[in-house]
Amino acid sequence: MTGVQTCALPISAVASAGKSHRLTTKYAATHYNNAYEFGWDKTDPFRRSADFTLSPWSVTFDGLCHRPGTFDIDELMGMPFSHLEERVYDFRCVEAWSMVIPYNGRPLRDIIKVVEPMGSARYVAFTSVYRPDELPGQASAFSTLEWPYVEALTLEEAVHPLTFATFGVYGDRHLPQNGLPFRITVPWKYGFKSPKFIVRITFTKDRPNATWHRENPSEYGWYSNVYPSISHPRWRSEDVV
């Protein structure tokens, strides 16, 4: 896994690593989630997300780009939700479980090119929403994470054709337990590298300090690519179900 991976994904790589599975049921994929903004239990995102405000939602682009700005979620989609592309990707968690999920969205690179990253931009940081009044996990005195959540990719990874700006799952855009209304899905990486509830995208020259990597770099490598031949320190990658 993560701690032993020190190189970025070659740009020619594809999301074919791992086993092939049938589609996970929508019920399973929406009732067993990691979204620590709602709490640490797998059922917390479903149970505690009813009052989470999905609309209005906007995303700010800043940093090393020629056309910074703030865009409404519908502007980012660029088309009616029903016309978005559907992609089926494996979602692999560092906890040694996985799901096969249909995501609705468009290539992230199509959005990134609109804001025109500068030649000096090498990384992209994704910052998630901070609303402790709506997100009990953020308000909890027992949370060990530093909020808001930040994850990052290299710019090369962010504009890879497989990196997916995601606005829905199973044809449904109203599932905050799955990180909606706007998240990124990166199929060749472990799940925590696919940030949820994104409200800011920042282009940088220096490598951002991502949340989980900052918390425990030996467990959560900065790249965290899924290589079936390279195992996690505590389990074999090929055993991820």
Indicate residue ranges for each PLM-predicted region.
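Short, small-residue-biased leader/transition segments that mark boundaries at the very start
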Residues: T2-L9
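Structured, non-membrane catalytic/scaffold regions adjacent to prosthetic-group chemistry
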Residues: A13-V241
